[in-house]
Amino acid sequence: MIKQRTLKNIIRATGVGLHSGEKVYLTLKPAPVNTGIVFCRADLDPVVQIPARAENVGDTTLSTTLVNGDVKVDTVEHLLSAMAGLGIDNAYVELSASEVPIMDGSAGPFVFLIQSAGLEEQDAPKKFIRILREVTVEEGGKRATFVPFEGFKVSFEIDFDHPVFRDRTQSASVDFSSTSFVKEVSRARTFGFMSDIEYLRKHNLALGGSVENAIVVDKDGVLNEDGLRYEDEFVKHKILDAIGDLYLLGNSLIGEFRGFKSGHALNNRLLRTLIEQKDAWEVVTFEDASTAPISYMRPVAAV
């Protein structure tokens, strides 16, 4: 049986919020079977919980924000991408502020944290959402699509009219049955344009952003001294974002996601459209792991 997974131990980290610039304390904790990923605002009394579900997404300006009434948690996508990539079904994410820390702008530090905590299999079958037919949403020349696929695959194309992008790969397709999320996707950092940063800061956004946690691009090129981690790091980060956004379905996917210039808003619209179309998907479990189209690495031992 492919079983659900949680963390073996509690683990903590500290960072800053990309948009708020505030110091944030993050604690990842094990959670019981069928809990899902639940964000907890531990700085509030009483603590407010927000399950990581598509219907709880509020704002999608520059990042994905979860809301419960007037309480929010910003920038959840990189941590959720790490949870998805390592197959974590159940966990509590405690935060001391309204934003997940940006760390280095990728999912890499979260992968390290989760691996350090260790993974534990639970005595319940892991649930997958299998895509049964194509579902597409489009808006303003952008497109996001689910298609049936026996495995999990993410294909993405970006289209930036800028010298830095023109010379680089702007499309990528990653089949996770043969490609490692940890090696090929998790370290891709978020990116931004120098020309946008002043505007964002005037609107109290990107206050914590720097070359320490993002690829910064100006008219001449990449400003980061160490350059890029992958030749196609820009489009790989869009794949990383999409994996995090897709995990708001609450289960791992069996299917392919195709994005063309898609972002957090359109990704969420695709999830909501899929959920409404009950004939487009089904929930499946696997009593025999050898019959599953997706193989997850064995639980990682605590370091």
Curated annotation (Swiss-Prot):
Alphabetized PANTHER family for the sequence: UDP-3-O-ACYL-N-ACETYLGLUCOSAMINE DEACETYLASE 1, MITOCHONDRIAL-RELATED
InterPro entries linked: Ribosomal_Su5_D2-typ_SF (IPR020568), UDP-acyl_GlcNac_deAcase (IPR004463), UDP-acyl_GlcNac_deAcase_C (IPR011334), UDP-acyl_N-AcGlcN_deAcase_N (IPR015870)
Family: Belongs to the LpxC family.
Catalyzed chemical reaction(s): a UDP-3-O-[(3R)-3-hydroxyacyl]-N-acetyl-alpha-D-glucosamine + H2O = a UDP-3-O-[(3R)-3-hydroxyacyl]-alpha-D-glucosamine + acetate
Class of the enzyme per the UniProt entry, highest EC level: hydrolase
UniProt-recorded Gene Ontology molecular function terms: metal ion binding; UDP-3-O-acyl-N-acetylglucosamine deacetylase activity
EC number: 3.5.1.108
Catalytic residues (UniProt): 264
The protein's annotated pathway: Glycolipid biosynthesis; lipid IV(A) biosynthesis; lipid IV(A) from (3R)-3-hydroxytetradecanoyl-[acyl-carrier-protein] and UDP-N-acetyl-alpha-D-glucosamine: step 2/6
Protein name as catalogued: UDP-3-O-acyl-N-acetylglucosamine deacetylase
Cellular component annotations (GO), alphabetically ordered: membrane
Known role: Catalyzes the hydrolysis of UDP-3-O-myristoyl-N-acetylglucosamine to form UDP-3-O-myristoylglucosamine and acetate, the committed step in lipid A biosynthesis.
An example Gene Ontology biological process: lipid A biosynthetic process
Keywords: Hydrolase, Lipid A biosynthesis, Lipid biosynthesis, Lipid metabolism, Metal-binding, Zinc
Pfam families xref list: LpxC
Keyword hit for Metal-binding: yes
Cofactor: Zn(2+)
High-level lineage: Bacteria, Pseudomonadati, Pseudomonadota, Gammaproteobacteria, Pseudomonadales
NCBIfam families: lpxC
Keyword Disulfide bond: no
